[in-house]
Amino acid sequence: MTTTGDHGQEEDAPLRRAPQLAVLVEGGDRKGLLHDMTAAILRHGGDILSVEIVERGARSAVYWELDGVEEPESLERAFLEIDVVTRLRRLPSMFQVYGKRIIVVGAGAQVGQVALGAIGEADRHNIRGEKISIDTIPIVGEVALANAVRAVGRLPRAVALVLAGSLMGGEVTEAVDELRERGILVVSLNMAGSVPEHADLVVTDPIQAGVMTVMAVATTALFDISRVSGRRF
């Protein structure tokens, strides 16, 4: 099992593990529908981990991920008793389907190479029961990069960020510090600027950076990020 220091707490974080219940509630749409659904969840002692409006308009589809529901079957009946609800389905949660998310941000060429390493390594762990997915966005510019880094903290199931580029600093560095405070692992390519000095791990080769990031978050890997934190490879 991976031991990752502060980042090893990810299994206990609500958005980084499977919820108790994942349901898709479908039917018509009207004002107050979400209010009625949340009231039903409250009556059954549930905590809302995630909600997504999949469809709205003439019809609605709302996907819920919930914890702490005292009687799941009773909650499902309560949903179906809402006047416009016509169908309810239990589904595998997003964590069960897509698992932990690694986000790769930066210049296109480097992002592609990091993704190559990360996807190849994730495949090795996913076939052994782990679930790790790789998200990428090629983007440049200090403000755009800083916004992208900060947004990782709002992404469900995001556990690590890889910054892939040739020069990053300034506001991007501030965003990196904020993200690390939220317990998200930050890996940086060895580049110009102040970002590498603030990352958990600095790797020169982009393919190896992708590989090492996956190893750091996979429960099926024996890799202690705390033992190499702050070092450059």
Residue ranges and their predicted role:
Residues 1-107, 111, 121, 136-140:
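A conserved regulatory-domain signal marking ACT and ACT-like small-molecule sensing domains
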Residues 88-233:
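Conserved mixed alpha/beta catalytic, RNA-binding, or beta-rich assembly cores of soluble enzyme
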